[in-house]
Amino acid sequence: MSLTMHPTKLMNDFFAAIEFMQRYPQAAGKVGITGFCYGGGVSNAAAVAYPELACTVPFYGRQAPTADVAKIEAPLLLHFAELDTRINEGWPAYEAALKANNKVYEAYIYPGVNHGFHNDSTPRYDKSAADLAWQRTLKWFDKYLS
């Protein structure tokens, strides 16, 4: 479905979900976001567009433009797959921008795994990396959303 939708409309749909959660009484006033692959890129974009997010956890997602990093206020927990050269090529510049702008972040590169290591419906699934990344994610959410 996402391949047939206009990218701006698709991103606006994700952003509408964030805005819904910001008004949702059970959200306790704090909203965080996570996403995988394309959704990881959405998570990074949301961190720029919604500085009021409580936290952001992208899994192997395209990084936001380095020029936009100053807008990020949410603490970031970033998960990368060592063998994912396409996504990882943007990481050094993104990390430099995060450091230069004194952003709160932690980043993990999981050794020997590829893009999609958390997706248990594909051959790229790596249970130990997925479990560790998910434990870290839940801890991050507990820290920033509780």
Where in the sequence are the language-model features?
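C-terminal catalytic histidine-bearing segment of alpha/beta-hydrolase fold enzymes
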Residues: 99-146
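Gly/Ser-rich "nucleophile elbow"/oxyanion-hole loop immediately N-terminal to the catalytic nucleophile
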Residues: 1-34, 144-145
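Short beta-strand/loop motif that positions the catalytic acidic residue
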Residues: 72, 77-80
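Active-site signature of alpha/beta-hydrolase-fold catalytic machinery across serine-
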Residues: 45-49
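Gly/Ala-rich beta-loop-alpha elbow adjacent to hydrolase catalytic centers
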Residues: 35-39, 43
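A conserved short beta-strand
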Residues: 52-62
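Acidic catalytic loop of the alpha/beta-hydrolase fold
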Residues: 83-88, 115
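Short alpha-helix in the alpha/beta-hydrolase fold that links the catalytic acid
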Residues: 88-98
